[in-house]
Amino acid sequence: DASFHSWG
């Protein structure tokens, strides 16, 4: 889970 990245 890459909730640090920023997609969407």
Swiss-Prot record:
A Gene Ontology biological process in which this protein takes part is: neuropeptide signaling pathway
One GO cellular component term, please give it: extracellular region
Where, per UniProt, does this protein localize? Answer: Secreted
Say yes or no: keyword Secreted present: yes
Q: Any idea which residues bear Glycine amide here?
A: 8
Q: Does the keyword Nuclease apply?
A: no
Alphabetical UniProt keywords? Amidation, Neuropeptide, Secreted
Job of this protein: This cephalomyotropic peptide stimulates contractile activity of cockroach protodeum (hindgut).
Q: What is this protein called?
A: Leucokinin-4
What organism, scientifically named, is this protein from? Rhyparobia maderae (Madeira cockroach)
